[in-house]
Amino acid sequence: VKDRAAKAMILDGIARGALTHDKTIIDATSGNTGIAYAALGAALGYKVALCLPANATEERKKLMKLYGAEIIETDPLESSDGAYNECRRLVAEHPEKHFYPDQYNNDANWRAHFDGTAVEIWEQTEHRVTHFVAGTGTSGTFMGTSRGLKHLNPQVKSVFMQPDSPFHG
């Protein structure tokens, strides 16, 4: 589902004129959204740089690199916070060089799930969904899908899970 949010944030940036081909898409990630950014960047002709903890899986890093993304590894003991802080530092240093979707604070993230994921779940369950359970990271998937399902049926119950370790993703 992370490709939906990445696509929505990138298309929003293009529509607003904030993302142009002279800028690099940069964001913090623990992996999945980063893979989506890298794939979309390759398909649309944008450079991509991704800040992620050094303990992210090699498979994820390899996929990002295969799509041409620059990987900026951060201290694994700082978890996703370290990647987020490094990304913000790099953007502050050279804002003119970067398009920073900021998946943690971008309404296009949760809207992608409100408009897409929730509707798909609703239709695929033939309107019989009663509960929605999701893990949280940026909370975009959980917030958007929960809001969307509750918009379709206020009786739907939403439950979120949170990793018990800072080493998630």
Pin down the residues of each PLM region.
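PLP-dependent amino-acid enzyme catalytic core
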Residues: V1-G169
